[in-house]
Amino acid sequence: MTAGVWAAVPVKEFAGAKQRLTPLLTPQQRQALAAAMLEDVLAALSEAPLAGIMVNTLDPLATELARHYGALVVTDSARDGHTCAVAAMARILAAEGREAMLTVPGDVPRVTAREIAAVIAARRPAPSLTIVPARDKRGSNAVLCSPPLVMPLSFGDDSFLPHLAAARARGIEPTIVKLPGIGLDIDQPDDVGALMRATPRMATRALNVIARGVATKQSPS
């Protein structure tokens, strides 16, 4: 275990999840995909060198999955969006005296414990910021803040460059780590295609849900 480094995972309620995937999957399949991706992420985190895992959610199934993998569940600002949910976890971890927070989204099913370890290994002495960009180099898919409140985070489709600029404005040169698993978040139909084509092939729970969903869409009525 790495003392003081906690994973922080914000999870929206699964009902109505992943609306942008409507052309590919039914509402029920999108909910199943959200749950499968979260479990893929939690499984990787549970095997990584972390002091603990915190999940911020109000979803009953997400709560059940989090507890199954030994995560601490909180609900502060859980319905206020990704940014507010992460900020709430950062405040909690800072108040508890934790050394660092590694925030990871719940929709990166190809993440591995080895990738998480690589992010942790790349961090510099505090104050520091380590960031893994999305594959399009626009989003911030994982951010390691040391200490947890080293700077405010603001997530969205174009958060990567603003996070770099914000760190530098505070005199912190961010460490950038490019990782294919963490870099592939599943939000758009082309992300699904990228997941299905990705090599080496991983038998993720998310891929199984997608394969079944696409097969159902393509089968004759």
Task: Outline where the language-model segments fall.
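Acidic donor-binding segment of Leloir-type glycosyltransferases
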Residues: 50-72
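Short phosphate-binding loop-to-helix
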Residues: 67-100
